[in-house]
Every structure is written in structure tokens, then in C-alpha cells.
Amino acid sequence: MLQQPTISRFFKSSSTRKKSEQRTAKEEAELMQLLESDGENNSATVPSDRKPEAAPMHVGLGNKAAAGGAVPGQVKSATRGFEDFRFNRRREACGKEQEVGFAERLQRIMERREGGCVEEDETELDNEAPRSKRAKPNRLTELDQQFKDLKLQHMDKVLAVRVGYKYKFFAEDAVMVSRVLQIKLVPGKLTVHETDPADHKHKKFAYCTIPDTRLEVHLQRLMHHNLKVGVVEQTETSAVKKNSGTSSSVFSREVTNIFTRATYGINETFGTKDRRVLGDSASVWGLVCKRQPSYTRYFLVSVNLNSGEVIFDDFKEERFLTEALETRIKYTNPSEVVVGDGLGSEIEKVFHTSDSDITLNRIELVGLYEEIFSEPHPAFKGNVPLQTALMLVHGYLTNFKNESLLFFKENFKPFCSKTHMILPSSAIESLDIFENSTDRSSKGSLLWVLDHTRTNYGLRNLKNWIAKPLINIDQIQQRLDAVQCISTEVGNIFIESLNNMLRDGQDLERILNRIAYGKTSRREVYLFLRELTQLATLFSSHHRYIETNVLSANGKIRMQSSLLANIFTDLDEYWKQFPIPNFLAMINIDAALDKNPDRPYVEYFNLTKYDRAEPLISKQQDIEAVIGELRDELKNIRVILKRPMLNYKDEIDFLVEIRNTQVSSVPVDWVKVASTKAVSRFQTPGTAKLVAKLQYHKELLQDLALQEYESFIKRITGEYTSLRKAILHLSTYDCILSLAATSCNVDYVRPKFNTAPQCINVINGRNPIIESLDVRYMPNDVNLNREGKKIMIITGPNMGGKSSYIRQVALLVIMAQIGCYVPAQEAEFSIFDQIFTRIGAYDNLLRNDSTFKIEMTEMVQILRSSTENSLLLLDEVGRGTGTHDGISISYALLRYFIELHNACPLILFITHYASLGSIRSPILGNYHMSYIEEKRPGENWPSVVFLYKLKEGRAHNSYGLNVAKLADIQTGIINRAYKISTMLKQEMESNSSIAAICTIKHALAGNSAASLKSAIETLIESADHEQFVLNM
């Protein structure tokens, strides 16, 4: 039988008697005499049918020894015999009942272990508590009860509770976290309300733990699952608890920080150094919907805490259409949407089925708009629903103490503007603007091609530029001038130094907002001011270059780029006005860089240069005066103890240390505080009063220093508007620098713009994304304009490059209108106000949308929103339904656009319906991606070699079997498919010809000209290599 050390303590120690220890008759008689005498002295009564249980031997022996009637040898022998007798009598009395009781007790302990009530590393809990301290069966431990109390106040959050050097998650939080983090879950109660059927089997909550050093990593993993996590910290130390006299209870705890994906980056306290901060682009929405029978009106306020940007919008959309709402989701990337009333099932589906993981939060409004926002933004005046949306965001951010951002009016801006276009969500998705459609990473996207930014705030601004291309030709030319100028000046020492400083710098925009929220650390404030000071120093050290090339009317930069000249001029003036170096000089560098958060605030300031140091210095002088009194008290102590070299043990508690051999010379009114084997430490009545007085002044100094630090932060926040403007200038410069780096690629050319509408003339244009992936790309021309072709019907084999070609055209337009060079030999564009796409086939099962329904919904949006200055990319419209219906829809759409004449937008139309190529119109042209057919042994179908070159004319085959071959489908299967395809094609041609001949016969018999014309047209359409002339 295996030994169980944790259970063996329940066995009472006893030894087996040897035969040599058997009692003699004389010893039995002596023992019985002792029992009789013990029974007389025992006050307890026993039943008459059993002998009295012997009292402890030392009592009886003590009586005999006092009477002088016992000798040592007899006492020892009698004691041993008495113990043996008691053991045997008790064993006989208990018998098997004792064994059964022990077995039951052991079973209960093992059940507690299996139920999680006894932890494997807490073996002392195996011992059952005395009856006086044993808890009630269903009573929670103090820690579990504390968690329950906190959880009931924060049911919408996952609570991470600090317990020593770990963080614990309990109950339903533990179940969720253990699944996300893939860590062990210790069994226990699974719900805080104890509603789970198995909860009654356990006395403690289920839990899982993580080390405190890994909290940041695990928090980010939880944030990726869009969980709201509250961090519960201990609000008292063991020393404070000991002094408070409550050391037996649990530490007091409270929720000290709350994290969500949108608020993590602005509220985190880990000092992350990553360039890409979690939730950097995520936002919080306040949304109000007003539903009408025919449309829904939306009132939106979107807040990005990291950038400080507050976007507001008021728009309406027809019922059952959500393109405009989805577009705003793509732009602002909300992770949390705050609403007051219900949105309706259709609108909620949009959030639940979007690519972003969005959480809906319903809150009740508290207070009035006029009471909270005394100076409202002009756009909110009179718009009550929009005010309500702002109030919803304010109420939600108040929980995180981030609402101060909403009081800076310069952060507000409308979603729509007359200076830029808004790319629809379908275009952002199908053109791979921010992420590729394969693995959703940034590689393989337009952002990946253009992103050479050096700062986080520059990257955020670049995303905004890409998503909202300019539609003002003067602003586009200004950006192109700046890109060209910076490309020629990149070797200048001032430009190079500025570029390096931005690359190695902090996220100034994020830190500025953290300062405004009061969430920053002392170290972060110092680094923020230091970088701004370095920028100011850079501009002042190159003042001659700036005066000559920027400020002068004939300066090289001012002559080449008014945008760059304005940026450098504003920054130069700002650095001269704002006293950043003075602020930095007020900080003690050693204390600022110290990572110890408990370091006194007074040490953060350099009091010799701090302009408000008088109260702090005065309080320090009070402390020095008390320390002087303590030194005088030390002189008196030396005299009393006759030890002239005596000093205090330390200058914290000011204790007097004396050897234990000399304690007798200590006055009686001294208080012993601590002692060791060698020494004892005392506090005199005088030092006790002075130490209390010293502590009082130190606390006053700490409070005063904290007030001065908060005042110092407010002085920086008071410059928020000017600082934000300067940082925006730096982000604009960073974006220009990024576009300049892209424009320096080989064979990139500056695009030209003309005021004439509807023009795309590109020679040897290339797809920038595919080319950047080190794939050899065949250049192609584009020629669309008002005088020539406005519609291109593009046919050709599958995988021939049709979709890549039309995407290339859209990407070139976007790059040109954000002010970047394009990959082409020559490029000329007009200004486009919208880019619409209908590319790809996909469904949405969660919203009950089939592939064809999505196609038609997108086409409705395009037909209603497009103008003559729009660019349309239509890829295989009608593919989601039957062939005949698909052809009919495509034909009807083309005829609709052709009939618009001059109001027709520029269209690139991909199709596999060869009959559509028979349509002729002055504004329509047929093109195909060229290829070469070749015959291979063992293959009945023609193989295709792709040339990826656009040519005029239409293709008569899609060569789908060739794609099947590329996918490694067996040759026999493809041969059979080719045979069936040929038979079906011949059958369709035969049926069409017979029907047409019959129609002609009847028409000739009836002399009907209309019927004859219809029959002839049907016959001609049945021939693949004939052309159908449509009289438009």
C-alpha cells in the first residue's frame, strides 16, 4: 500500500508492545490500585456497567508523590502500564467504529481535493479546522466573497484580481479566460450567482491564474477577443494592514483600471515601446438611429482616443441598404458602439457580421447637454439627435476617465467634406486598400506599398489620406510639389536630421492625449518634452537654412512647394514661442527616468529652476528643522547612555540601538520597538513626538508636490491646441516623406491632371501592389475619355489578368489623387469624385444574403450614387444566378449606361458572356486579355498560354478547363468535361438555328417585316463568330 504523507498525520502514534513488556500479577494489582485511587479523585461520573476511564497519569502520580507513597522505579513502571491499559481499553471501546470514522473522514478530504476546495500546493488545508472555526458548508472564503462583491458591480467586465504575485480570474471569468489563453482551469463554482447545477458541489469559485509579469501580454490577447477587462489591485500594503490591526482579513481591493480594445493604448501603464499599439486605429461610437418607413437616418459621433480625432456625421440611407453605414465602419474601425435605444435587428446584424469585432453597449443618459458642454461645437447646435450621440460617448468614456477629449473643439471634424472623396466599403475591400483579401494582413495592400512613415501619428494620417483621396486639383498639385521638392532636398543635413529624429521619436500625438486625459507617467512626460525640445533645437540650429530656403520669398523650398514652406514656417514660429526648454529644465532627469512609481513627486522637480518652487522649498525647510531637532535629541540620548559616538539606526524611524547586555541602563519610559539576540531598538518619548511631526511634514510635502505636478501637467495641457497643430504639421511632413519614398521607385512618374472631365490616359501602367510583391507584371495602356471610349468590355480566359487590370486602373487613380507618383510611363487623369466596385463573389450567411443578392444590392448603390465623374469597376455582374438571367442583367445594365450618353461614367466591365461583345456603340469598346492556344499530347481541349496584354476585340472562350488543369484535376475528368461541353454547345447552336429558321418560314408566309427582322437577328446571334450590330 502506497504511503500518503498528507494523510498519515491522522494516525495517532503508538508502538507495538513486546512480549518482554507483559505485566506480572503484582504489576496488575498495583495498576488496579492506581485506577481505584484515580477514580476517587475523578469528578466525572461513568456508567455502572463499565470501569471509569483513567485520568492522565501525572495527576494520580502527583498525589502519590506528594504523600511520599511512591518511588521513581514504581512510578515509571506504573506509568507505562497505565498508558498501555488506556490504549487497549479505548481501542476495544471504539473498535471498528473508529476505523469507519477515519475512512469517512479520508473520503471527505479526497472529495474536497477533487472539487478544488483544497489546492495541491496548500497541503496545510488538508487538516480540518477546529469545530469553533469551521466555516459553514456554503460560505465562501473571504477572497471569493470579495471577488463576488466586486463582480456584482462590474458584470460587464472580466476581472483580473491581483493576489500576491499573480492575477486570478474567478467563476465565469475564469472559464472564458482559460479558453482564450489556453491555461488550466481549477474546478469550482462556475457562476457568481451560483446558478450552475454543479455549483453546490464546490465551496470556492473556479479560477485560473497568470503571473503579474505577463499581464500586459495576456491583456492584449484578451483585447483581441474584444473583452472588457477590469484590473483589480490591492489598495493597501502588508505594512499598512499590520498597522491597521486587520491583518487577519484579506487585503482591500478595488478596480483601478479598465481596458477595452479602443481604450487600451491610451490607458495602458506598461510603457509599451511597440510602434503598432493595440487599438491604435480603433474608435468608440455614439450612435442614434431614427427609422422611417422608407429610410433610416443615422447620427454618429466617433472618437479615436489615440489620435484625439472626433468625427461626427448625419446621414440617411434607404431601408434595407447599409452601404453607407458599412463605409463608416471601414473608415473609423469601431470596436465599441454605444447606444441608448435599440437599433433594430437589421442594423445590429451589420455590426455583428462585420469584419471588425464590435461590441454594442446600451447606457442611460445622465445630465443635460447644455450642462456638460457649455461651449458646444457649431455643428451640434439645434441637432438634438447628434447631441444625444455625443452625450452617449461622453457617458461611456466617463467610465474610463477619458471624456476630457470631447471638450477640445479643434478635435471635431465632419466625416464628409467637399475637398475629398469617400471610398465605399466595397471598394476598400475589393481593391485591398488596407489589407489583403487572403490573410487580412497589411502585406499586399495599397497601404503596405505606400507606408514609409517614421511615426505612428504619421501612419494614422497616411491611412486617412489613402481612404479619402483629394478631389481638389490645387491641393493635389500642392502635395505633388511637396513630394518632388522633398525628393530633391532629401540629402540636405536639416532634412536628414529631421527625418532621423522622427524615426527615433515617440508617438507625440498619443502622449499628448494621454497627458490631456491624466493617464500619462512622469517618465512619459519627460520624454515628450525632451523630444519637442530636440525638435526646437534642430530648427534653431538650422535657422540660417530656414531663413534662406523657407522664409525668404525667393527661397528654394518656398518656390518649389508652398505646402512644405508653410509647414516649416509654422513649426519655426511655434518653437520660438512655446517655452518647451524651460519646462524641460524644471524636471529632475534622474527622477523622471526612474521606473519606480513610488518615488516622491517632489524629487521630480529641479527646484533650482522650477518657477513655482517656493512652497516646496519652504516645506522642505520645515522638514530639515525637525531633523535638526532630532539631532539635538540625539545629543541628549548620548548623555543619558554615556555613549558620545552613538547614532540613530537609520533616519527613517530614528531608533536607538543598544546591546542586550546594556538594556538595564535604558530609562523606563523608552519603548522597545524591535530586538534580536544581540541588540534591542528603542524609541524615546522625544524621538516619538519628533518622528510623528516629521512624518506629518513629509505627508504635507508629498501632497503639495502632487498638487504641483498636476498643475505642471495642466500647464502643458493648456498648450494642447498649439501642440496638436504642431504635431499635425509633423504628421503631414511624415506623409509627404512616405509618398516621396514611394515615388522614387523605378519607372514611377508624376501624374498630370486636366480640368476636362472623364479622362484616363495611361501608357504602360502597372499594378503597384503586384509589382511590389516581386512579381513580373506586364504593363498595359488605358485610354478612356469623353471623346473616345467611355465603356470597356473586357473578356478573356480565366486567370488571364482581367481583374488585376481593372484594379490597376483604380489604384493608379487613387495614388494620383492622394498626391503620389504612379507606376507608368505616362499618366494623365481627370478628377474623379467617386470610385465604385462590384468585384468578386461572396455571400453572407449570417445576414441571409446570397451571392446574387449582394451583387444586386451593390449595383443598386452604384446606380443611385454614381455621376459622370465617377469610375466604375464591374467584374462579372450576374455571375451569381443562371446564365440567361445573368446575360439579361448585364445586357440591361450596359444599355442603361449607354443611353446616358455624356452623363455616362467611365466603366470597366469584365464578363465571360461572349454575346455581350456583340454590342456596338460609339462610347463602347471591346477588349480582351491576349493568349496563345496550343495543343498538348493526351489533352482533347486546347491549352492556353497567358500573355497578360490588353488587346482590342473580344475573346470567344473562357478556357475554364485550362484553369482546372492548373488546379491539378485529373486529365481524364477534364477530357470528359470537354466532350460534354462541346456536345452542349452544339446542341444549343442547333436549337437556336432551327428555331430561327422556323420563325423565318412563318414570317415569309405572313409577310411580317417585324417578325422577319427578329428571326434574322436571332439566327445571327447564334453564330459565335458573327457580329451583332445594335442600332442605338
UniProtKB/Swiss-Prot annotation:
Component of the post-replicative DNA mismatch repair system (MMR). Heterodimerizes with MSH2 to form MutS beta, which binds to DNA mismatches thereby initiating DNA repair. MSH3 provides substrate-binding and substrate specificity to the complex. When bound, the MutS beta heterodimer bends the DNA helix and shields approximately 20 base pairs. Acts mainly to repair insertion-deletion loops (IDLs) from 2 to 13 nucleotides in size, but can also repair base-base and single insertion-deletion mismatches that occur during replication. Residues 18-29 have a biased composition (Basic and acidic residues). ATP binds at G796, P797, N798, M799, G800, G801, K802, S803. Belongs to the DNA mismatch repair MutS family. MSH3 subfamily. The lineage of its organism: Eukaryota, Fungi, Dikarya, Ascomycota, Saccharomycotina. It is found in: Nucleus. The gene is MSH3. Heterodimer consisting of MSH2-MSH3 (MutS beta). Forms a ternary complex with MutL alpha (MLH1-PMS1). Keywords: ATP-binding, DNA damage, DNA repair, DNA-binding, Nucleotide-binding, Nucleus. Coiled coil: none annotated. Residues 1-59 are annotated as: Disordered. Its main location: nucleus. SMART domains: MUTSac, MUTSd. Residues 136-262 are annotated as: Mispair-binding domain. GO terms for biological process: meiotic mismatch repair; mismatch repair; mitotic recombination; removal of nonhomologous ends; replication fork arrest. One of its GO terms (molecular function) is heteroduplex DNA loop binding. One of its GO terms (cellular component) is nucleus. This is DNA mismatch repair protein MSH3. PROSITE patterns: DNA_MISMATCH_REPAIR_2. The keyword Membrane does not apply.
